[in-house]
Structures are given as C-alpha cells and as structure tokens.
Amino acid sequence: VVTLPLMAAAAQEPSLQDLGDALTPPATAVIYTAKEIVTLDPAQPTAQAVAVQGSRILATGSLEQVRTHLGRRPYRLDATFADQVIVPGLIAQHDHPLLAGLTMTSEIIAIEDWVLPQGTARAAHNRSEYLQRLKEANDRLKDPHALLLTWGYHQYFHGQLKKADLDAISSTRPIIVWHRSAHEVYLNTAAERKYGVSRGWFDSLPESPRKQSDFANAHYWEQGLFAVLPKIGTAIASPERIQAGLQFVRDYYHANGVTLGAEPGG
C-alpha cells in the first residue's frame, strides 16, 4: 500500500518509473476532481484534485497544481466525483497485517468458518472435530518432519489441549498450535526437540515467564510466549511464510476495500 504522503515524498527524486516514462510514451493520466479529497498528509490534509495513472497516484492538490505537476504528460479530466468526498479507502488502524498473514496462511482449524481466497476453512465445533481435523492436516503432509503450524484453537470450544494429544497426532513431525488469540502456543515433543525447548532452557527463565508457562504440556502464554518465541520464531515466521502471508494480506485487504493497514507498536 502506498499512501499519498509517501508518493509526495517519492516525487521529489527521479525514480525507475520516471526513467521508464522517459523511454516510453506515457499513458494518459486521469485527473479526478471532487468536493474534497482526504489525503492523510498533515501538510496538505485536503485537496480538490488527484491525478492517477494506472494504480499510481501522481499528484494531489488544486486542479491547477495537479495540471502543473503533470507538465506535458497527457491527461483527461473526470468529474465523476465532483460533488463527493474521496477518502483513502477503509483505514484499518489495528488489524495486524503481519499476524494476519502468518495465521491465515497456516492450517486454519478455528471456531468459525473462514472464507478465504484459497478456500473455506470450516469450523471445528468441539474437541473431537478439532483433533480429527488436526489428524487430517498431519496426514496431508508428505514429509514426516515438516512443520505443521495451525491456528484457531480455543479451549472453550475444543477442550484442554495437552502435549500428549499432539504427540498422538505425530511423534516425528513438529506441531505448533497457535491459539486463536495469538497469545498462546502449544508444542508437541518433536517441536520441543527440533527447536531446543528443553528443561534446562525453561529453568533458566525468569520467574514471570515460567509462571505463564506449563512446561509439562509445552503450553506458553503471554510472557511465556515471548520467552519461547526466539526458539520457534524462525519456523513460524520464515522468509517464505512472511512473503506468502504479506501477499495474501495485500490481495485480501484490497479485495475488501482496505487500502491502509497498521501493525500497532507496543
């Protein structure tokens, strides 16, 4: 997502786009005029015109300013929105794009249906349905040592989850169950072994994360989760998973009208 302020800053220096424009005849730009255009730029919070070429915003400002910016580039005027207000799509201030990307591209076994571009992940309504779905997900993976990362479990619907439950699914494949809240994880023995989650490591932790962990069942929440993340983080957020996740988020957000998303700081 490219916001108007960033485009304004980028316009101050030559770019590859500018070089391409110099080598090939530029496509016709469109100048949209409106009653008001909200820009999200503190230096210019509103405008009356915006120039667009393809999917790129070229300039905002008054009609005269936009025309001046385009120079000799061909353009046409479009007054479709002359009596309307243009805003930058749906602004989602607290939607965790990175978290969404990592969870939505994992094996989704949740308490409700998730209708996604790659298909619909049906709800698991109780413990038996959840464990059966987890077994099926394990069986679909041909490599017995490949990670099974799943998101959506919730104890209020699926019952308490023990390490023995996950070990019964696979004794060779690392399994990481990411709680629906994203604040908790559960591991099986193979995951502990692969990622170095040992008794010695656990005993070396400060008191607070140890109190928010159940080592016997490989269950870590809140500060316990932050303690174990350095061990499992490269598996959950590998470069391949991050890339696939962010591509999913981009397409999913745009398809639903979200043009600006934010990962809140903490």
Locations of regions flagged by a protein language model:
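Divalent metal-binding segments
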Residues: P14-A34, V38, P42-G266
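Bacterial N-terminal signal peptides
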Residues: V1-M7
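Short, low-complexity disordered leader/linker segments with a strong preference
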Residues: A8-Q12
